[in-house]
């Protein structure tokens, strides 16, 4: 099992799909990384040579992935909260950030509905 960027990649998948298991790598980025490394996209992970793995690791060094990316995202959210922006307030209150309505929906962000005793009459 190839271990790249601290993630164990599945052996039986094509490398272009296996790279998407790394946080911060989608399909487009995976194709670009493989093109930079000179590795064909249809190769299975188990068939990679150690030289190809090293080339992929070198190409991934230019991309921000895993822990660095998670840290940057959390710092961005923290910065929005500290400056008191509208988006920061929505993050702090656990409400949708991007303008969705909350009168009826937004259950994913708001959590399970809490009934209020004595409301129905």
From Swiss-Prot:
Keywords: Ribonucleoprotein, Ribosomal protein, RNA-binding, rRNA-binding, tRNA-binding
Disordered: annotated span: 89-121
Gene Ontology terms: biological process: translation
Gene Ontology CC terms, in alphabetical order: cytosol; small ribosomal subunit
InterPro entries assigned to the protein according to its UniProt record, in alphabetical order: Rbsml_uS13_C, Ribosomal_uS13, Ribosomal_uS13-like_H2TH, Ribosomal_uS13_bac-type, Ribosomal_uS13_CS
Any GO molecular function: rRNA binding
Ranges annotated as biased composition (Basic residues): 106-121
Source organism, top-level taxon: Bacteria
Description of how the protein assembles with itself and partners: Part of the 30S ribosomal subunit. Forms a loose heterodimer with protein S19. Forms two bridges to the 50S subunit in the 70S ribosome.
Alphabetical list of NCBIfam families matching this protein: uS13_bact
Family of this protein: Belongs to the universal ribosomal protein uS13 family.
PANTHER family per UniProt: 30S RIBOSOMAL PROTEIN S13/40S RIBOSOMAL PROTEIN S18, SMALL RIBOSOMAL SUBUNIT PROTEIN US13M
Function of the protein: Located at the top of the head of the 30S subunit, it contacts several helices of the 16S rRNA. In the 70S ribosome it contacts the 23S rRNA (bridge B1a) and protein L5 of the 50S subunit (bridge B1b), connecting the 2 subunits; these bridges are implicated in subunit movement. Contacts the tRNAs in the A and P-sites.
Designated name of the protein: Small ribosomal subunit protein uS13
